[in-house]
Amino acid sequence: MFKKSLVAVAVLGAVAFSAQAADVQLYGRIDTGVRYTNIDADVANQDDVSKFEMSSGNYTGNRFGLKATEDLGNGMKVGFVLENGFNSDDGALKTTNKLFDREANLFVTSDFGTLSAGRVGILNGTAGSYAIGNFNPFGTGWGDVGNQSLLWGAGFDSRYDNMLTYVTPDFSGFKVYAQYSFGENGHENKSSTNRYAALGATYTVGGLNVIGIVDTINKKSYDSTTKTTSDVDDTYRVTVGGSYDFGMVKPFVAVGYFKDGKIGDLLGTWAAEANHKANLDRYYDGYGLTLGASMPAFAGTAHAMVGYMDAEYASEANGTVTSGRQIDVTRFVLGAGYEYPLSKRTLVYADLGYFKDEVDAADAAKDKFD
């Protein structure tokens, strides 16, 4: 085992050295707009919370990056991607203490497929070199509007460190993808870190695109900060969907199932305003459905989606199960958007979203929350 580890390090080192001779491309995107949000907590004697603000990354995440590929001959190529995320409204890094937070990967491509190592986006998303989760017109972009993660995100991060990714060659439109993360730095592949794994496949022929992904979070069993054991169940998720481009319209349909997943951390600032936040911080089993479509309209493109989620209480945030506790969360999501290109590189857009959670909760004392 020790010799195999040394061989792997030597190969990656050679790839990094060779990639320095490649032509390096600088690229980026910037997205700034204004956003109005209204939150009704549905609590007696509590006013709605409204906010009008300048914001960045409403349509697509702001980024700049470096990437390069070098042809080594005999069908083999090496390359890298280094991509930073930032806020265009205040200039701050999107992620504290990470320069290339969106992606930092080194890859080798040959007739046997592509092997990548580093920080990359997960398969079940729409950001990164190997993301295949285009399950609705909005994907995981457009901020909270139409975001499919609201339906089956289940507490998965959009990216993980120390990730190995393998992609097979294209077999008549069919591809298989696999990912495994060793966990965060300093705790790689130890019981004190969460580890992500995924297996996915796509089939693309003509206008048809079919996607299937199974992924999981292998939860840590030891907390190195508190020096205590952890008994939180692993999270599992299965997502299947597809789309077909008819030219005049492109419909999307998808369904996702999750087990022992978190739903509260999907809402960002929305959860902080919700009167049922304590319920959303627990773990749930559930499913989500989405229907959507994109179509050309007035020299631009219009998008629309509708989504529904139903989840039932599985355990507390620490993994324990409270006897007699019954919580059911239903979620309804609507999204509409329009983008209009001013040139090959510049576009304007507008979107409108609606989101509603209903929580029916009862413990042994029959307490109710709406």
Where are these regions (language model features)?
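Gram-negative bacterial Sec-dependent N-terminal signal peptides
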Residues: M1-D23
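Outer-membrane beta-barrel architecture
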Residues: A10, G65-K67, N105-T109, T165-V167, ...
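Outer-membrane beta-barrel proteins
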Residues: A16, F52-S56, K94, W152-A154, ...
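Outer membrane beta-barrel
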Residues: A22-Y36, K51-N185, T193-N209
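Gram-negative outer-membrane beta-barrel proteins
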Residues: V34-D42, F86-A92, L123-G125, E184-E188, ...
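Repeated loop/turn-to-beta-strand initiation elements of outer-membrane beta-barrel proteins
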Residues: M76-V78, F112-S116, G173-V176, G207-G212, ...
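Detector for outer-membrane/organellar transmembrane beta-barrel domains
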Residues: A198-G335
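Outer-membrane beta-barrel "beta-signal"
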Residues: K368-D370
